[in-house]
Amino acid sequence: MAEKRNIFLVGPMGAGKSTIGRQIARQLHLEFYDSDSEIERRTGAEISWVFELEGEEGFRAREEKVIEELTENMGIVLATGGGSVMSKESRNRLSARGVVVYLKTPIEKQLARTQRDKRRPLIAEAEDPRKVLEELAQERDPLYEEIADITVQTDEQSAKFVVNDIIEQLESINGLG
């Protein structure tokens, strides 16, 4: 790669941001970060515990700080948390400091991928996870679209196909690869 440019993955929970991000980083020889994992590393606690103790507002403040710091690096792939786009500052940083890839995933796939994951505080205790995901999509989808340079559907394709599709699009818009 002539120019090391950051790649930021956004999208709802269960879109495959971490899985896809790791594979992109591996193929392009970039460093991979996951904002949720970074928060867990820094706090020494699971996201659900941070949510329980500090509420969503406290968690979002931590997330914003992590995104601010990580986006200052060059040559990284960052999988962001699904709600990271709720912060205007984070949206601005992501847009200004790299290529934003929106992994678009239907509610059905999100449900299938997240139904047994107790580490997702917004749906773990929900009576109706589908309704929660639909409400989150209504609120967040326009924000993902607002900052996306590339949008890729992740519902029916394999991770390998999605990764190759993203890399091809990155090469065409940026000369990456």
From Swiss-Prot:
HAMAP family, alphabetized: Shikimate_kinase
Primary residence: cytoplasm
Annotated signal sequence range: none
Residues annotated to bind substrate: D36, R60, G82, R140
Pathway: Metabolic intermediate biosynthesis; chorismate biosynthesis; chorismate from D-erythrose 4-phosphate and phosphoenolpyruvate: step 5/7
Catalytic activity: shikimate + ATP = 3-phosphoshikimate + ADP + H(+)
Protein name: Shikimate kinase
Keywords: Amino-acid biosynthesis, Aromatic amino acid biosynthesis, ATP-binding, Cytoplasm, Kinase, Magnesium, Metal-binding, Nucleotide-binding, Transferase
Transmembrane segments: none
EC nos: 2.7.1.71
Subunit organization: Monomer.
Functional summary from the UniProt entry: Catalyzes the specific phosphorylation of the 3-hydroxyl group of shikimic acid using ATP as a cosubstrate.
Alphabetized Gene3D superfamilies for the sequence: P-loop containing nucleotide triphosphate hydrolases
Localization (cell): Cytoplasm
Binding site for ATP: G14, A15, G16, K17, S18, T19, R120, Q157
Native organism: Idiomarina loihiensis (strain ATCC BAA-735 / DSM 15497 / L2-TR)
